[in-house]
């Protein structure tokens, strides 16, 4: 029985299956953890959702910002952008079933025995684990309710960007969503910066990666996250695992086997399509 953690799939179905074959993943015996952003940019978002849903109790995933955006597109709130390559999924006969399943997935996964926490973007240093649990439940409850389109319509935006237990209503839900699915940099006090997307070496002062600011969760738990492809899986402190290595941009899909901390990598098929000198986005 092994636990495999895989970074952002982004519709790269062929690479996902190849990677799972490489590690000899066995549903029913092994468990697969996915850092979110299952969909968008890659060519196989429909196949990814169908496969992951079919795994049942053998998979533990968290929602990412692209997964939430897909739900907003399906609800008619946001525009379907051609670059996201979501049309086959949106027009599939089982789209309703898949997306109703997707919106009932969590923002946070915790394994107390392994002392392991997973969220798409990470855990803000302003939260302890109990607060993170409560905040995740707040958004999950709305997403799984009949009023979820109202939330999806209001989730876009960068404010508020500083946590307070006094936050209420849509502002509270928006902060929680941004912290779990969009966060990269913070100010020294933990306040979110929602604008900078570069590598940590290029970030303007006084911004720091969220994981470089001491927080109560990281003191007791390992944290696995995705979202930040330009990290290339590097530069995090011990116990912090950055797993998004930019498969949909021509990088790779990365898997961490938890029991022995061994990494496995599947190169992106997209590098074959990138022209010479073409930039690889992050």
Curated annotation (Swiss-Prot):
Sorted UniProt keywords: Hydrolase
Enzyme class: hydrolase
GO molecular function: bis(5'-nucleosyl)-tetraphosphatase (symmetrical) activity
EC number: 3.6.1.41
Gene3D superfamilies membership: 3.60.21.10
CDD domains linked: MPP_ApaH (cd07422)
Record's catalysed reaction(s): P(1),P(4)-bis(5'-adenosyl) tetraphosphate + H2O = 2 ADP + 2 H(+)
Family annotation (InterPro entries): ApaH (IPR004617), Calcineurin-like_PHP_ApaH (IPR004843), Metallo-depent_PP-like (IPR029052)
Transmembrane segments: none
Domain of life: Bacteria
Family to which the UniProt record says this protein belongs: Belongs to the Ap4A hydrolase family.
Complex formation: Monomer.
Function: Hydrolyzes diadenosine 5',5'''-P1,P4-tetraphosphate to yield ADP.
Protein name as annotated: Bis(5'-nucleosyl)-tetraphosphatase, symmetrical
Species name: Escherichia coli O157:H7
Gene name linked to the record: apaH
